[in-house]
Amino acid sequence: MDETLAEFFRRTILKIPMTEMMTILKTWNFLSENQLQTVNFRQRKESIVQDLVLLCEENRASLNDAAHLDIICDDIDLFDMEQFKSSFKKILQRALKNVTVSFRDAEENSVWIRIAWGTQYKKPNQYKPAYVVYYSQTPYAFTSSSRLKSNLPLLGQALTVASKHHQIVKMDLRSRYLDSLKAIVFKQYNQSFETHNCTTSLQEGSLGLNINMDSRIIHENKVEKERVQRVTQEIFGDYPQPRLEFAQYKLETKFKSDLNGGILAEREEPLRCLVKFSSPHLLEALKSLAPAGIADAPLSPLLTCIPNKGKNYFKIRDK
Amino acid sequence: MSALRPLDKLPGLNTATILLVGTEDALLQQLADSMLKADCTSELKVHLARSLPLPCSVNRPRIDLIVFVVNLHSKLSLQSVEESLCHLDAAFFLGKVAFLATGAGRDSHCSIHRNTVVKLAHTYRSPLLFCDLEIEDFRAAMAQRLVRLLQICAGHVPGVSALNLLSLMRGSENPSLEDL
């Protein structure tokens, strides 16, 4: 077997954690039971790997077999859930004596973590726990808003270290609906969930009105209406929007006015202003603004970029 | 863009056409549906437009009554109506124009003061009607009323013309010129 191929085997097998070694080798099914029995799995990892590579050479392993092994390694979840949980719990308990941490495994390789925070002198408050959902296959975790904001850095640190990442970044994305947050963050929102008849005319597609239009009603601005529908559909798509309740814009921009003069127009410093949009279903409401005639189409990109950017809290400054 | 003139076309047989102008399409659509459900001996046609001037159209029938719908919750709707009024032939204001203000019931949502629309209607010497179009019963009642106005403006009611109607309506609802 040539040098580079042997090296490739060595490195691939070295990457496999010992806990998964037997499972992966059996799934690969390249080395026979007898051959595996000849390897002493109690020695140091480097020696085990060396023995396995020699066996591969004996079997005249080809590049295809190596590629096959590589695929299997990627396929099997090499993330060690138990290790994550124990590491996470240890970090919190070392920092804060009074804390209760519990776990529940859920679907899609996720783990729900319940944390009851205490302080140095007080027992953990079981009535106001914080919840975290961590999806191990992704670099994302979702937390419920904890009343004790001071514990957030510690929580962040515990998550980072236990999941073997380097740093944690807080996203400016908040909602009460976990599924919507997941849809935005995992970019799964732009899939239609229902079969859609693509030949539906634009009029029937709008807001549920005009389904059986009376021929005695005539829309004078049909062309404009269709343009608005088309632009709205291009921006928002046909699919149901993820559910958010707020969009908040913190403005720190200079005051601009059409009126000449005025006290505010002469200010050099930026004017601090907060604009907050709230709705039971913000994105659907924004989608319906132009077709309802309340706003012009296309809408401001500050509003339409929310799912794309994964943000609903913005800070805007003059450039 | 053609200017709308009240008498430049021949009327259709027993047909009355109303034009509703307003920015909020959903409200106009609902009002149109309510009007068509109302009792009426004439054949009704309802045209909906966002603003004036209207796009060019040879097939448009003669417009007998124009109602400008202003949503008191939206400054944009008032602004759009004000801009549209400039594109209307003066002859329309002899009884063939009315203003309809909606949203007065929810005072906390109103960004336009009631007096603003009152002044607007007075400036154009046309009647002003108030109705919360979102409430079905009120809308149905207003629709019935508009149908009656429309029939008079189309000349389907013997003995009453649009101009008569104007002076009749002014007495009961709108303050006279001296009061404002």
Curated annotation (Swiss-Prot), chain B:
Assigned keywords, A-Z: Centromere, Chromosome, Cytoplasm, Kinetochore, Nucleus
Instruction: Specify the superkingdom.
Output: Eukaryota
Q: Which Gene3D superfamilies match?
A: P-loop containing nucleotide triphosphate hydrolases
Q: Name one GO cellular component term.
A: nucleus
Name it.
Answer: Centromere protein M
Q: Where in the cell is it found?
A: Nucleus; Cytoplasm; Chromosome, Centromere, Kinetochore
Recorded coiled-coil stretches: none
Q: Which gene encodes it?
A: CENPM
Say what the protein does.
Answer: Component of the CENPA-NAC (nucleosome-associated) complex, a complex that plays a central role in assembly of kinetochore proteins, mitotic progression and chromosome segregation. The CENPA-NAC complex recruits the CENPA-CAD (nucleosome distal) complex and may be involved in incorporation of newly synthesized CENPA into centromeres.
This protein's assembly is summarised as:
Component of the CENPA-NAC complex, at least composed of CENPA, CENPC, CENPH, CENPM, CENPN, CENPT and CENPU. The CENPA-NAC complex interacts with the CENPA-CAD complex, composed of CENPI, CENPK, CENPL, CENPO, CENPP, CENPQ, CENPR and CENPS.
What is the originating organism of this protein?
Bos taurus
